[in-house]
Amino acid sequence: MKTFALILADGQASRMGGEDKGLALLGGKALIDHVIDRVRPQVSHIAISTNRNLEEYARRSPHIFPDARQWQHFGPLSALCTAANDLQLATADWLLVVPCDMPYLPDDLVARFETVSKRTPLCNAYYVETPITMHYNIMYIRPQILQSAIPYLFSGMKTLRSWLQQQRARPVRFEFDGHFADLNTQTDLQEG
């Protein structure tokens, strides 16, 4: 089974003072590098969605793309709508979508998603659930469903949660919430 990763690094990072969150340092290393180190052993290809510092991100993966102009400023859905037209991503069996600000993702993230997907073969989308919350921005999806994000966004809807509900996505339970800590502020980075 061929699984690709799409790392979302295209947010405005308003809680980070506008600093490019993916390039913010945690322990002397960029957040996105922590995420790449966690997902690289689990996938066969990594793409990065980013709207700035394209050259810097290209050092990490040759497969980078900014949000298409018509989708900019709609959050993670912008990246999904743009990815819907990416021919290379379309060749994957599954697409792991993760944000660039979660440096502690579990080493068995894809394996857990794969196990559940084999038990529920008619389901095309999954997301992370922990004892504390749902993490809709961590998805395991069939690339074919990305096309549905376009009319969803055109309809005025903007949340990942509602889009995933439309896809009849199922949660996959992870017991340790710490793996999914997102570092959104400079204080988070200092405490991280």
Curated annotation (Swiss-Prot):
GO aspect biological process, one term: bis(molybdopterin guanine dinucleotide)molybdenum biosynthetic process
Subcellular localization: Cytoplasm
The protein's required cofactors: Mg(2+)
Binding site for GTP: 21, 67, 101
InterPro entries attached to this UniProt entry: MobA-like_NTP_Trfase, Molybde_CF_guanTrfase, Nucleotide-diphossugar_trans
Recorded GO CC terms: cytoplasm
Signal peptide span: none
Keyword Endoplasmic reticulum among UniProt keywords: no
GO molecular function: GTP binding; metal ion binding; molybdenum cofactor guanylyltransferase activity
Pfam families tied to this protein: NTP_transf_3
Predominant location: cytoplasm
Family from the record: Belongs to the MobA family.
PANTHER family: MOLYBDENUM COFACTOR GUANYLYLTRANSFERASE (PTHR19136:SF81)
Subunit: Monomer.
HAMAP family noted in UniProt: MobA
Protein name according to UniProt: Molybdenum cofactor guanylyltransferase
Species the sequence originates in: Neisseria meningitidis serogroup A / serotype 4A (strain DSM 15465 / Z2491)
